[in-house]
Amino acid sequence: MKLVVDASVAVKWFFRDRTDESQMDEALNVLSGVATGAIELIQPPHFVAEVSAVLAREAPEHAQRDLRDLQDILFSIRDDAAVYARAMKLAIQLDHHLFDTLYHAVALETPGAVLVTADRRYLAKAKAEDRVCSLTGSRALISGERP
């Protein structure tokens, strides 16, 4: 299965001990699928930078270690012209920040890929679009059920 995860999902992988983080089990389920090879991650070019910015701000004492761990996770990058064009179209259509629409554009431009997000604001705007799934719905998606 091919997934794109945005920073709202990926940062949860590093905040496992936080009691205020919701949907932790779902986020770790995605990470487990990546580790076993059941899930192939395809990401936009700013993925590491965006996640790293949150790690540096929220957990500076562990940020360097967490960055190394993030870089150890296997994923490929999509940064071709079609991705940027689709992201621009989505940003205008949804009146939303391009950095968020880049994740969705990668999913839309990669055959069979789905964006998984914990960003409720983006999900509310993009729910009419194809190939976007809430983190809550990801477990059903990964298991082959309909989210």
Regions found by a protein language model. Name each.
Residues 5, 42-43, 78, 98-101, ...:
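Short beta-strand scaffold positions
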Residues 38-39, 96, 110-112:
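Short, high-confidence coil segments that cap the C-terminus of an alpha-helix
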Residues 1-43, 55-65, 129-130, 141-145:
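Short, well-structured N-terminal submotif of metal-dependent ribonuclease cores
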Residues 65-94, 105:
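Acidic catalytic patch
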Residues 2, 30, 48, 76-77, ...:
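Acidic, PIN/NYN-like endoribonuclease modules and their adjacent C-terminal/linker elements
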